[in-house]
């Protein structure tokens, strides 16, 4: 079977919500929602090998460290393993006083009772009950009328009320989900939720959580936002309800739907770290939280050590975090493209020069350092990279700040190596290539400095006297000029017949303090009009310039050969 030329014969577009005066498009997110992690329930039921108790406890500890205050810890009626874990956690003393655990149950008497039993001994807990309300479920799965489906919800609400009353030592809270809300009629969802509220009698001080799930994402995020706003505007006693969102990612817009849902009036978000969950996954709590953070809103969740968080999540779920996953992926802060690298490099340079803390670096919506990432991986070099890439790598790794024209010269060496190897070049590759290209090592060097002296003559000129190796043999040399650079150039001309003219000179410190070294760069012209570059590095800035001249001399000899 192949894709249809006319998919309209098989699929129908989702009907829009009649909400001509919608308000959510004009709103912004200015404060964080209540966060509920369902990693230990929805996330766990969606992995090939569900977590054992060791992994669940490790994941729970991680969520506590991040700052999640509401954690769904399981589906106790699913089996003895789930029940035992929940009971064990409740009695372990590991649940901080400011964290409320939650369990999920279907709207059946025996399952609800079992759920309350699993939470006996808890300081505070949320019991979350659900039943599906959409036409497909009513007509195909249950074969029930609207009223029959509503009575399931009402009966479940009465059980929540009565079971909680039997256990007054726990601070009980309730959550109701009209499952499949996003594909159900809004008037019916409102009718069912109002009936549940009539039973549980929530107040503004103790609201009922009404969770409105996109159980299967069926429309664009704006439609979901319309549904949420319509529901919020038409729910009686709205202040006694905390509107919660549980989006899925079937159409790839679970995060967007959750964000627009917040703008539409929701108070709470359910999801998983890095979007784990059934099918294409749940809303990613990391993405939503850090989206807020990059808009200047404190999400109340701490992802300062994101690599450690990823390590734990991957271990517990047995699933890798995609390298392109927003904020957490291995490659999300990495640029290979030359133009991107150049923009990022300039952005960092400008950031250092400004006196304000405002983050403005092209291609990086967040400072990687805020998440515990280093800058070394921001720019990586391959055959697609430009000058900005390797220049950044050298500066970050070695403190080398290449002049623009030297970047262009070195680019030929980097490009040639990248083409030869056919892979990404790491920092060691680039540093090794740089040292070889500018004769910072003995390999391939005709001239190498051993030692020297500079003296001042009575006429004001400078005399350079030194020992250099030429072809591996020591040779005493000397020359006179107006300064150190010119005296070394005179030495090369008089002793070896090398005519080199300095066109430009740059120097800077490598590091700070008394242990700082110096780097010197010389652009030089040869008699035939070609140019060569010399690079010198030494503890002493004067010696660095001498080494740079000999580096240029080595390049000149190589050109002649």
PLM regions with names:
Residues 1-109, 373, 378-381, 385, ...:
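N-terminal capping/small domains of soluble enzymes
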Residues 2-41, 296-478, 514-517:
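A mid-to-C-terminal "edge-of-domain" accessory segment
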Residues 4-6, 11, 35, 51-70, ...:
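Alpha/beta enzyme core
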Residues 21-26, 32, 44-50, 55-60, ...:
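Non-catalytic terminal/interface segments that mediate subunit docking, oligomerization
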Residues 42, 46-47, 76-80, 134-136, ...:
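Short, small-residue-enriched loops and turns at beta-alpha junctions
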Residues 137, 212-214, 242, 270-278, ...:
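Short beta-alpha connecting loops at secondary-structure transitions
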Residues 216-353:
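Catalytic alpha/beta core domains of metabolic enzymes, predominantly
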């Amino acid at each position: 079977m192949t894709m249809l030329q006319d998919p309209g014969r098989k699929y129908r577009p989702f009907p829009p919500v009649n909400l001509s005066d919608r308000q959510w498009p004009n709103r912004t997110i200015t404060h964080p929602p209540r966060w509920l992690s369902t990693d230990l329930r929805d996330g766990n039921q969606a992995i090939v090998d569900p977590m054992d108790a060791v992994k669940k406890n490790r994941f729970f500890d991680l969520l506590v460290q991040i700052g999640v205050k509401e954690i769904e810890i399981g589906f106790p009626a699913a089996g003895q393993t789930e029940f035992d874990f929940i009971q064990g956690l409740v009695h372990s003393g590991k649940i901080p006083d400011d964290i409320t655990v939650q369990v999920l149950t279907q709207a059946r008497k025996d399952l609800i009772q079992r759920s309350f039993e699993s939470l006996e001994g808890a300081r505070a807990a949320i019991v979350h009950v659900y039943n599906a309300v959409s036409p497909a479920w009513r007509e195909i799965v249950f074969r029930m009328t609207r009223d029959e489906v509503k009575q399931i919800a009402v009966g479940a609400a009465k059980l929540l009320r009565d079971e909680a009353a039997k256990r007054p030592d726990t601070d009980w809270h309730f959550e109701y989900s009209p499952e499949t809300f996003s594909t159900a009629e809004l008037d019916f969802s409102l009718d069912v939720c109002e009936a549940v509220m009539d039973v549980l009698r929530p107040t503004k001080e103790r609201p009922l959580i009404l969770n409105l799930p996109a159980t299967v994402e069926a429309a664009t995020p704006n439609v979901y936002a319309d549904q949420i706003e319509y529901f919020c505007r038409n729910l009686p006693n709205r202040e006694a309800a905390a509107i919660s969102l549980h989006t899925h990612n079937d159409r790839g817009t679970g995060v967007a739907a959750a964000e627009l849902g917040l703008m539409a009036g929701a108070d709470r978000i359910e999801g998983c770290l890095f979007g784990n969950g059934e099918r294409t996954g749940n809303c990613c709590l990391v993405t939503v939280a850090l989206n807020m953070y990059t808009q200047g809103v404190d999400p109340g969740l701490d992802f300062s050590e994101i690599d450690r968080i990823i390590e734990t999540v991957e271990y517990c779920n047995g699933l890798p975090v995609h390298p392109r996953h927003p904020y957490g992926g291995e490659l999300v802060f990495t640029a290979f493209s030359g133009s991107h690298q150049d923009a990022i490099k300039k952005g960092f340079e400008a950031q250092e020069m400004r006196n304000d803390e405002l983050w403005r670096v092209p291609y990086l919506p967040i400072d990687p350092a805020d998440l515990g990432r280093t800058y070394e991986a921001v720019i990586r070099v391959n055959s697609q990279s430009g000058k900005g890439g390797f220049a950044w790598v050298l500066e970050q790794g070695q403190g080398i700040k290449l002049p623009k024209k030297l970047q262009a010269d070195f680019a030929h060496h980097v490009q040639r190596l990248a083409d030869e190897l056919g892979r990404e070049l790491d920092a060691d590759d680039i540093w090794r290539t740089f040292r070889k290209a500018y004769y910072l090592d003995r390999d391939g060097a005709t001239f190498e400095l051993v030692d020297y002296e500079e003296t001042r003559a009575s006429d004001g000129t400078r005399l350079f006297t030194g020992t250099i190796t030429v072809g591996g043999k020591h040779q005493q040399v000397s020359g006179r000029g107006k300064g150190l650079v010119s005296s070394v150039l005179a030495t090369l001309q008089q002793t070896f017949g090398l005519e080199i003219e300095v066109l430009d000179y740059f120097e800077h410190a490598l590091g700070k303090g008394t242990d700082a070294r110096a780097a010197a760069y010389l652009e030089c012209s040869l008699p035939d009009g070609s140019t060569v570059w010399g690079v010198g590095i030494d503890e002493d800035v004067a010696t660095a310039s001498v080494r740079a001249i000999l580096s240029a001399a080595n390049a000149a000899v190589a050109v002649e050969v």
